């Protein structure tokens, strides 16, 4: 998760030891009465991320059935915890003076800065440096990627943030309202992206958050829906995961993006969690 990216060491870890330790942490997380930020919650998830960014040669597709089931459960727990962490901090930010000038108070802000820089470089290398209009699907209560892109990289671009949670959008909207210039070019839409159709054709670039479509079936459906309605030659940036990082996030594979032109795939080897898959809808 972007919110929990931390520094790794260079130690190699065997698949057997990795799986055993991940299962142990999953068991501990599963017994918690709440995933709201606390010393215990933060410690467990920090240890999990440290483990998953260690160099390893694990093949996620070859995991035994019971380990795959644990992995799916763990991804859901990670997503829930990340959402609660962002909501708590976004609520705090919305109540202070100049919240957009204080984003760096968020403990993992620099990790979002790193990821946004990587994604902007990938877009720039594919000729998409200053899109007129961008959509971010699954923006949440603290849409740091949109904030960073809009203020550091795409300073004239209009951003529409889509989230299924109206309360999350309300908090994010309060933060943006503190900056009249940014508020003019950043809006929030509440609803299921599967119900958004013609509007998707307005965007030069669409970001798909890693936790939108938690299961393989849902992810493929969402990718197909976006491809159907997005503009021709528009680009879609999808966050994925590789290796042990796939205990934290769903994986998007090449067979999941049929009908798209695959422009590039980036896999991190440092403290960044997310892989980045850049796609283009072909012109027909």
Protein language model regions, located:
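A short glycine-rich, Lys/Arg-flanked "PGG" loop and its adjoining helix->strand segment in the class I
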Residues: 220-235
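Conserved beta-strand signature within the Rossmann-like core of class I S-adenosyl-L-methionine
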Residues: 233-243
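Active-site capping/gating segments
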Residues: 244-284
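Conserved SAM-binding motif I beta-strand of class I
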Residues: 158-164
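Conserved SAM-binding loop of SAM-dependent methyltransferases across substrates and taxa
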Residues: 141-156
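A short SAM/SAH-binding and catalytic strip from SAM-dependent methyltransferases
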Residues: 193-195, 202-219
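Conserved Class I S-adenosyl-L-methionine-dependent methyltransferase catalytic core
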Residues: 46-129
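S-adenosyl-L-methionine
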Residues: 170-203
